[in-house]
Amino acid sequence: MAGHSKWANIKHKKAAQDAKRGKIFTRLIKEITVAARLGGGDPNSNPRLRLAMDKAFGHNMPKDNVERAIKRGCGELEGVNYEEIRYEGYGISGAAVMVDCMTDNRTRTVAAVRHAFTKHGGNLGTDGSVAYLFKHCGQLLFAPGVGEAQLLEAALEAGAEDVISNDDGSLEVITGPDTFVSVRDTLEKAGFKAELAEVTWKPENEVLLQGDDAVKMQKLLDALEDIDDVQDVYTSAVLDT
């Protein structure tokens, strides 16, 4: 459903991220720090840290910044101790929304998240209210024009779970969260470079929003993304504006 909007949605997401590069650096440093604290400072034995470092270097973060974040996570440098929290709720037309945060002040964060939901026509739900509607997986999105047959063969040989052909001509490769890095690297060596590659929470069923509803939903998502403590926002909504 709503495959025709997939590429437009991804391009909007990338443009929004590029416009908030400073905020992205802050979020990536938090993720690297927490990943190192929980799993150690060696990316070869810590997949979460490896992903965070890959993303940081993909955004041209200086190596010194990355190394300092790892040292803070490992306790070699002093730093803020962040707590991971997930909030769940509903947006326009009941579209599911998950908000992943890292914070040193839970009270401040929940107040900001609740305010964004309330102001923009959504509702903050309880733990577990929408998480079951999403699948934790790796996602690689390829622009329209990539050879479907060749990508399908290469992806399945690399260990991907599925290859989805969207109505707009874009292709999605779905992996398990633990096999994402190996599939991505194998495909890149075979000449397939994804426009977007991430471990994400993919909705099991999408909700197509059009016109005013799509505009309202975008405002809610933007408001959540603008909160300093927010790391990622996931939604079942596909916006057709």
Curated annotation (Swiss-Prot):
Superkingdom per UniProt: Bacteria
Molecular function GO labels: DNA binding
Listed GO CC annotations: cytosol
Location relative to the cell: Cytoplasm
Keywords, in A-Z order: Cytoplasm, DNA-binding, Transcription, Transcription regulation
Xref: InterPro entries: Integrase-like_N, TACO1_YebC-like_2nd/3rd_dom, TACO1_YebC_N, Transcrip_reg_TACO1-like, Transcrip_reg_TACO1-like_dom3, YebC-like
GO biological process: regulation of DNA-templated transcription
Family statement drawn from the similarity comment of this UniProt entry: Belongs to the TACO1 family.
The protein's name in its UniProt record: Probable transcriptional regulatory protein NE0210
Species lineage: Bacteria, Pseudomonadati, Pseudomonadota, Betaproteobacteria, Nitrosomonadales
